[in-house]
Each structure stands twice: as C-alpha cells, then as structure tokens.
Amino acid sequence: MCEKIAAGILGTGSYLPEKILTNFDLEKMVDTSDEWITTRTGIKERRIADPSQATSDLATEASKRALEDANLKPEDLDMIIVATVTPDMNFPSTACIVQANLGALNAAAFDISVGCSGFIYGLAIAQQFVETGMYRNVLVIGAETLSKIINWKDRNTCVLFGDGAGAAVVGRVESGYGILGSYLGADGTGGKYLYMPAGGSRMPASHETVEKNLHTIFMEGQEVFKFAVKVMDSATIEVLERCGLTPEDIDMLIPHQANTRIIEAARKRLKLTNDKVYINLDKYGNTSAASVAIALDEAYRKGLIKKGDIILTVAFGAGLTWASSVIKWSK
C-alpha cells in the first residue's frame, strides 16, 4: 500500500515596502488620533507601497525569499497561486505576472480573491495538488497594495490597512508533518459589509464612479467585527477537531492581523498564553491576504517556530469568508 504524500511548507518569505505611515501622520490627514486608532485596533503604523510598485512587485520579492528558503529555483515550481484583492489589473492574473517576473515558466498560475482569508485558502488548494501527487512544488502568495484602493478621506477605513506580501512554497515533507487539515467557509449574504463597489461588470468604471470614490473600500465596521469574533472561534475549534487536536496542543497561533481586540478574544477563548500568539499588526496594519503569510514568515525567521510545533492559522475576510489550518512544522 502506498504511503500518503504529506504536504507542508518548504520555505517562506515576505516583503514590506520601505515607506512607513504612522498614526501621527494620519492625524494630519483626517480627523483622528494616535490614541483613538491604537485603542480600537492596536495599529501604530503601516507600510505604503511606492506609486511605482504594483502588487506583483511585492509578491515577486516575497517569492524570491521563499524560494531561497526552500532551496528551490523558479523552474522547480509547478504552480503559482496569488491571493489578492488588489491585482495589478483585471487580467491577466497577477500570478501570471509573478510567473514571468520569476522566470517560473513551468508553473501554472492563477489568482484567488477571498479577501483576508486568501492565503489560507491558497495553502489548502496547494495541499490538494501536492497530496494527490499531481504537483511537487506550489508557490502560494498573499499580496496587497491596499493603499491604492483606500479613500484617504474616510477615517474609518484609511487607518486600518497597509501594503505587503508574504509567500510560502508548499511541497512534499516527511510523513506525519505538514498541513494536517484545513477548514474553509463563506457566507455570501455578508458581502455587502466589506466590498469595493465599482470597477467590475456590475458597475464599470466611469467619470461618475471615480468622482464618487466608488473604487475604494467600503466597510460596515461593526458588522465585520461581530462576524470576526464569532468566526475566529468557530473556525479554530472546527479545524482542531478535524485534526483530532485541542487548544492545549497549539504551540503558535498565527491569526489574521486585523484588530488586537479580535485576536485577544480568540486567545482567551483558546486559553493560550501571550507568547503563543504572534502579532505584528502594530507595525503593518491589516494587509488582507498578505497578513497571515507575513506573520508566519516573521515568526519562523525569529525562531519562534521549530520542527514539530503545531501551528494554527485563522483568518476572516471579504465575502464574507473564513479559513483556518493546522500545520505541524517540518523545517
């Protein structure tokens, strides 16, 4: 009987733009304060991409670092998945642009649009291709340039988001390690709570849509907050049960970096100590699909994750969507 192929993470990488926008900078732009932002979100600063940088540029840099960490060449890749809500353009996909940038011409390439849940969705997709034996090396990227779709006059949203990219190479690992399970979900009835109205077939771009700022993020903050608190709980418990694990088995929780109050509520329900929860939103804000990918790479490179550790990732996002995964670290 053939032994089941285990799919895990071979390498990680991340990239953050150089420009830092602090809460004090935002005080000069909109009616807000450092105290207000910090108290309600935990965010102190965020990174902003240069006007010349597109999402694919950030994704490419993160990918190079992930490939180096995995000791692989671009031509070793069989597939590239980019999770983003800020693609370079409607088509071709940002993944195809990254493929060309890397010279990974043996790889299939496509984008997924799952909001902040995108990177974990991508890991789950990659896991299936590797475990079935169809592909050996799949590059999963979460990348965003949210600064380009923010209404900088809307103090309720412009303080929340930042730019960045994270990447992971998913491939074969030793039996018993790797991605142990995933849980993905969606509730399309909540799509109205977090969306960008214009630019698609429902509302094509026009002078009117531009003048009305309809190419920017619209969010019902309270509705998203209530959804997030509920789903962070259910998604973590569900994926742990699927893997036959309990909260006591978690060595590191890597949550979507949206709001410290949401993360703290999840930490308390799981009864985890602070050192078992990785948080970097104070530095980067909410980077949507890049959030979990960047945090995972940072935690690994800081030595906070070691071989055999049980890593729980969880996210929620536009759609509305949610995703969680359990990884037994193999590096």
Curated annotation (Swiss-Prot):
This protein's GO CC annotations: cytoplasm
A GO term, aspect molecular function: beta-ketoacyl-acyl-carrier-protein synthase III activity
Residue ranges, annotated region (ACP-binding): 257-261
Reaction(s) this enzyme catalyzes, per UniProt: malonyl-[ACP] + acetyl-CoA + H(+) = 3-oxobutanoyl-[ACP] + CO2 + CoA
Main location (coarse class): cytoplasm
Domain of life of the native organism: Bacteria
Enzyme Commission code: 2.3.1.180
Keywords: Acyltransferase, Cytoplasm, Fatty acid biosynthesis, Fatty acid metabolism, Lipid biosynthesis, Lipid metabolism, Multifunctional enzyme, Transferase
Protein localization: Cytoplasm
Physiological role: Catalyzes the condensation reaction of fatty acid synthesis by the addition to an acyl acceptor of two carbons from malonyl-ACP. Catalyzes the first condensation reaction which initiates fatty acid synthesis and may therefore play a role in governing the total rate of fatty acid production. Possesses both acetoacetyl-ACP synthase and acetyl transacylase activities. Its substrate specificity determines the biosynthesis of branched-chain and/or straight-chain of fatty acids.
Complex and partners: Homodimer.
Protein name: Beta-ketoacyl-[acyl-carrier-protein] synthase III
UniProt lineage: Bacteria, Bacillati, Bacillota, Clostridia, Thermoanaerobacterales
